[in-house]
């Protein structure tokens, strides 16, 4: 082929370039740019809202607190005078930001005289509700009342029995439901509803958190200051109301991880949140309790830590409880949590995992995922009854 053609079609001409020396190849590999390592700090800086699903930050009370101290949780736009109004998405300068699943202050500046919430607790799963009530117990003075209004499961089922669509009916007009079962499902889930109660189930939940549930009307509380604060009434809604009276004090203990096994920690961000990658099968984060505790004396356990890699598996984590009797595990369901870093166990889970409520727990561990998974690691929160 002639010279001009070689310039136009160089690929048609055989290459006569010398191969690079062996040492040059080695050096190019050594100095070649490596893929950037994913860091949680970068996600926090660039997308703090997304990173917040895997991290946490201790809630902060306003600097100036009224005396007496009355708390209003999940206030939305219903700002109440005489209360410290708290909401995860403040719409008003009078409202302080508060994520009910982030750690609460400890100790509190002073015990709260009481609390009020309406249409709030049902937006969390059952174990999360227990966590919230345990934190609330620790914030309240002895005998104080946490007033709670929410939709009643029993009243919802009764309303939906024999459901048939009709003009102007809320569930049909808003969600297009046309059958009884669909109406019940819509009522339990719309607007972020996650777990409804009847009188019996709420009383049990309250008892686990050290409260006695006293049924009231939606308007009248056993505490005058908490009466007539309601937005909804029994007429025209499924609402029901209870005063949760603090009967047994609950104490929260927070422990830093004692051992991190099979996980390469890459960095630490925020409030001592470790971020790393699982390197071995059977990786664990362990917390040694200050002293042995019978499983039946523990109201709630939360091992903080999220898995950022596995979104299709719902049972990849386990809580492991150890004592002189041996070891028992409780599988965690990722679909039953509002926030990825919450790894909760209720009293029934503790008793089942340990083989009895009388068995003593000395150590708790979290198995956070499989090899290659990126995870956050935080403290263990134990809520125990102050007998």
Please place each PLM-identified region on the residue numbering.
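S-adenosyl-L-methionine-dependent methyltransferase catalytic module, highlighting the catalytic core
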Residues: 128-131, 135-141, 145-245
């Amino acid at each position: 082929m002639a010279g001009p053609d070689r310039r136009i079609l160089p690929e048609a001409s055989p290459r006569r370039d010398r191969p690079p020396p062996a040492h040059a190849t080695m050096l190019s590999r050594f100095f070649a740019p490596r893929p950037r390592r994913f860091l949680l700090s970068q996600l926090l800086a660039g997308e703090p809202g997304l990173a917040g699903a895997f991290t946490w930050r201790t809630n902060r009370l306003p600097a100036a607190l009224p005396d007496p101290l009355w708390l209003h949780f999940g206030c939305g736009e219903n700002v109440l005078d005489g209360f410290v109004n708290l909401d995860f998405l403040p719409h008003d300068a009078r409202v302080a930001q508060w994520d009910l699943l982030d750690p609460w202050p400890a100790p509190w500046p002073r015990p709260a005289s009481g609390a009020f919430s309406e249409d709030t607790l049902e937006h969390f799963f059952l174990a999360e509700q227990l966590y919230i009530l345990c934190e609330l117990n620790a914030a309240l003075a002895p005998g104080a009342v946490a007033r709670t209004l929410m939709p009643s499961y029993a009243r919802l089922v009764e309303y939906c029995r024999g459901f048939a669509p009709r003009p102007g009916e809320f569930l049909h007009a808003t969600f297009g439901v046309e059958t009884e079962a669909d109406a019940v499902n819509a009522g339990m889930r719309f607007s972020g509803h996650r777990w409804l109660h009847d009188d019996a189930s709420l009383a049990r939940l309250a008892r686990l958190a050290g409260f006695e549930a006293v049924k009231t009307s939606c308007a009248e509380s056993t505490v005058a200051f908490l009466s007539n604060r309601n937005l909804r009434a029994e007429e025209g809604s499924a609402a029901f109301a209870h005063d949760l009276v603090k009967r047994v004090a609950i104490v929260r203990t927070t422990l830093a991880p004692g051992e991190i096994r099979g996980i390469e920690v890459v960095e630490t961000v925020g409030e001592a949140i470790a971020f790393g990658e699982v390197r071995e099968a059977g990786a664990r984060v362990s917390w040694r309790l200050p002293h042995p505790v019978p499983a039946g004396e523990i109201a709630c356990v939360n091992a903080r830590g999220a898995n950022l890699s596995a979104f299709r598996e719902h049972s990849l984590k386990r809580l492991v409880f150890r004592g002189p009797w041996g070891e028992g595990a409780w599988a965690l369901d990722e679909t039953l949590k509002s926030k990825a870093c919450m790894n909760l166990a209720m009293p029934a889970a503790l008793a089942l995992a340990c083989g009895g409520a009388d068995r003593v727990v000395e150590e708790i561990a979290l198995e956070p995922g499989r090899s290659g998974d990126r995870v956050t690691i935080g403290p263990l929160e134990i809520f125990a009854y102050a007998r």
